[in-house]
UniProtKB/Swiss-Prot annotation:
Lineage start: Bacteria, Pseudomonadati, Pseudomonadota, Alphaproteobacteria, Rhodobacterales
Sorted UniProt keywords: Amino-acid biosynthesis, Cytoplasm, Histidine biosynthesis, Lyase
Disulfide partners: none
Molecular function via GO: imidazoleglycerol-phosphate synthase activity; lyase activity
Active site: D11, D130
InterPro entries in the cross-refs: Aldolase_TIM, His_biosynth, HisF, IGPS_HisA/HisF, RibuloseP-bd_barrel
Similarity field: Belongs to the HisA/HisF family.
EC number: 4.3.2.10
Self-association and partners: Heterodimer of HisH and HisF.
Catalyzed reactions per annotation: 5-[(5-phospho-1-deoxy-D-ribulos-1-ylimino)methylamino]-1-(5-phospho-beta-D-ribosyl)imidazole-4-carboxamide + L-glutamine = D-erythro-1-(imidazol-4-yl)glycerol 3-phosphate + 5-amino-1-(5-phospho-beta-D-ribosyl)imidazole-4-carboxamide + L-glutamate + H(+)
Gene name in the database record: hisF
Function of the molecule: IGPS catalyzes the conversion of PRFAR and glutamine to IGP, AICAR and glutamate. The HisF subunit catalyzes the cyclization activity that produces IGP and AICAR from PRFAR using the ammonia provided by the HisH subunit.
Name under which the protein is recorded: Imidazole glycerol phosphate synthase subunit HisF
A GO term from the CC aspect: cytoplasm
Functional pathway: Amino-acid biosynthesis; L-histidine biosynthesis; L-histidine from 5-phospho-alpha-D-ribose 1-diphosphate: step 5/9
Length: 261
């Protein structure tokens, strides 16, 4: 059985790791290069580096900072933010990324995913989906609910259904979905489990649950109830609430297969 991955996330702005609530009110959370080194030593399974202002500021990812982060990181590294073209993907892979994440560009042109996957393989192409609840599930009425995608760092509504879009980009060649609930981001209230389950059930590739982790039980729920293949968290690790080791031990105790170091 494949091991469930625990992935710290570095949301980077102006060269610093930041953390907010619902994608706003960002506060400083440290130096990304130092954090990459620390998470590597702590036994994280992967690391996610997202330049969260690149698209909004209409620029590419900060390649120099990405390179320096990759140099300190000997676990798989996913880099995203401002990724638009095959050349962007190539440059980030050369900078040290193992996987590259599309977000806003994939919404504007899903074929960019196909072009990148054709060139480099689906195994290194991730599509990040930032979604808000527009209609909560109502099981008694048979309503599965609806979640809308937002782009440009969560600033721009699209009207696009998150579950249907996940199917589209996987058909185009995405090898993984990084799914963030904007409603839960930074709230420490737990993952949006109906959203996570809906997307996990809809696509045949791994889904990373993101947004809302406040306790170790939330990590477990993302897998057991949300169906995620991996769980991503930021605040609980950046600010020392829990360690990677504590998270893995808790998941193992719950019967979830994890890589114990």
């Amino acid at each position: 059985m494949l091991k469930t991955r625990i992935i710290p996330c570095l949301d980077v702005a102006e060269g610093r790791t930041v953390k907010g609530v619902n994608f706003v009110d960002l506060i400083d959370a440290g130096d990304p290069v130092e954090q990459a080194r620390a998470y590597d030593l702590a036994g994280a399974d992967e690391l996610c580096f997202l330049d969260i202002k690149a698209t909004h500021e209409n620029r590419g990812t900060m390649y120099d900072l990405a390179t320096r982060t990759a140099e300190q990181c000997f676990m798989p590294l996913t880099i995203g933010g401002g990724v638009r073209t095959v050349d962007d993907v190539r440059n980030l892979l050369l900078a040290g990324a193992d996987k590259v994440s599309f977000n806003s560009a994939a919404v504007a042109d899903p074929d960019c995913v196909a072009r990148a996957a054709d060139k480099f393989g689906s195994q290194c192409i991730v599509v990040a989906i930032d979604a808000k609840t527009v209609r909560p599930p109502a099981p008694l009425r048979g309503d599965p609910g609806r979640w809308e995608i937002f782009t440009h760092g969560g600033r721009k509504p699209t009207g696009i259904d998150a579950v249907e879009f996940a199917k589209t980009v996987v058909a185009k060649g995405a090898g993984e979905i990084l799914l963030t609930s904007m409603d839960r981001d930074g709230t420490k209230a737990g993952f949006n489990l109906p959203l996570t389950r809906a997307v996990s059930d809809a696509v045949p590739v791994p889904v990373i649950a993101s947004g809302g982790v406040g306790t170790l039980d939330h990590l477990v729920e993302g897998v057991t109830q949300g169906g995620a293949s991996a769980v991503l968290a930021a605040s609980i690790f950046h600010f020392g609430t829990y360690t990677i080791g504590e998270a893995k031990a808790h998941m193992a105790k719950a019967g979830i297969p994890v890589r114990l170091t």
